[in-house]
């Protein structure tokens, strides 16, 4: 039996989520519904502009893969996370918040610098817009990816955002190769249509000879496979992933388990905040399959979890909600 169910790699960010208006986004030149990488100066400008926006502010450790690992841990999976923080106040907050969720963080002592931050701006239509300053996360190295702990894991899971620069692409590629050589199953999320379109070469470099499991939404699937229909995208994904999951928002999700397709309808819910839905889905799905469930069961479970997170503000749900979702599925 392995020490960990899932070993995650990704950005280590402190997420600050806040409700804004469409007018605020337009006034400050923020592209709605997108994840935009910004420098420290731009983020400071937005922080100052947001000081007057005091409605529903939430702060938590974050980053896409981090959110998924926290979700999997909260359902009961054994988890480890590799990311890079600085020795500042935000870095301390990140580690404390992550550990509180039951996730083990790497043991490399942080250095001086600035911990990455993500401003998540949610408009009344529940759409989330992210402006991210990666900070220390950009300096992720092979050191944070503790090989002994990775080898002791069932699965490696990483976010596609890692491929947005060459240095972290190499870290991700090496981790993938190490995992394969040591019998660790590999999983990756395509993360964002922008990432898939602009950094397709880096993504292909990391995926290499193929992954055991790939997560994406329909737009990402169409973009990465250069397809016009979902059917064509499904055929294209079969050449790079042994299994995969395509989320389709309100329509639910489709998965390929290596031999056949499975699908699950969307769970009817009133969307309050879509931030974290995809991350929650991936975390819940990974928890399900590491617990021995099949892909159809995992789809239904992950759909229910994602619906629960979009029905409230913030990418996290209360501890009791994880128990309620499990009870819904008799576990």
Short names for language-model regions:
Residues 79, 105, 186-187, 244:
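Hydrophobic beta-strand scaffold residues
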Residues 117-121, 252-255:
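Short beta-strand scaffold segments in enzyme catalytic cores
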Residues 155-232, 251-252:
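Conserved beta-alpha-beta core of the PfkB/ribokinase-like small-molecule kinase fold
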């Amino acid at each position: 039996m392995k020490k960990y169910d899932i070993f995650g790699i990704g950005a280590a960010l402190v997420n600050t989520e806040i409700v804004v208006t469409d007018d605020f986004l337009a006034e400050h030149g923020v592209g709605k519904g997108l994840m935009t990488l910004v420098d420290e100066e731009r983020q400071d400008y937005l922080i100052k502009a947001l000081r007057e926006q005091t409605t529903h502010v939430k702060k938590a450790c974050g980053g896409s893969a981090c959110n998924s690992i926290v979700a999997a841990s909260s359902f009961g999976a054994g988890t480890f996370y590799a990311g890079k923080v600085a020795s500042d106040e935000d870095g301390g907050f990140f580690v404390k918040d992550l550990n509180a969720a039951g996730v083990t963080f790497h043991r490399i002592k942080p250095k001086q610098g600035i911990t990455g931050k993500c401003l998540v701006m949610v408009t009344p239509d529940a759409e989330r817009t992210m402006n991210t300053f990666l900070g220390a996360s950009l300096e992720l190295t092979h050191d944070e990816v503790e090989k002994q702990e990775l080898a002791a894991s069932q699965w490696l899971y990483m976010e596609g955002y890692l491929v947005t620069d060459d240095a972290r692409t190499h870290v991700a590629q090496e981790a993938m190769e190490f995992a394969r050589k040591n019998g660790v199953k590999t999983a990756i999320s395509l993360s964002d249509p922008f990432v898939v379109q602009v950094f397709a070469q880096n993504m292909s470099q990391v995926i290499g000879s193929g992954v055991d499991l790939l997560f994406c939404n329909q737009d990402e699937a169409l973009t990465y496979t250069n397809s016009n229909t979902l059917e064509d995208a499904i055929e294209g994904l079969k050449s790079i992933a042994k299994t995969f999951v395509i989320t389709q928002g309100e329509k639910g999700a489709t998965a390929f388990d290596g031999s056949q397709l499975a699908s699950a309808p969307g769970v009817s819910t009133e969307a309050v905040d879509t931030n974290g839905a995809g991350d929650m889905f991936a975390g819940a799905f990974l928890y399900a399959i590491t617990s021995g469930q099949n892909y159809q069961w995992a789809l239904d479970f992950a759909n229910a979890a994602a619906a629960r997170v979009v029905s409230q503000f913030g990418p996290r749900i209360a501890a009791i909600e994880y128990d309620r979702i499990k009870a819904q599925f008799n576990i």
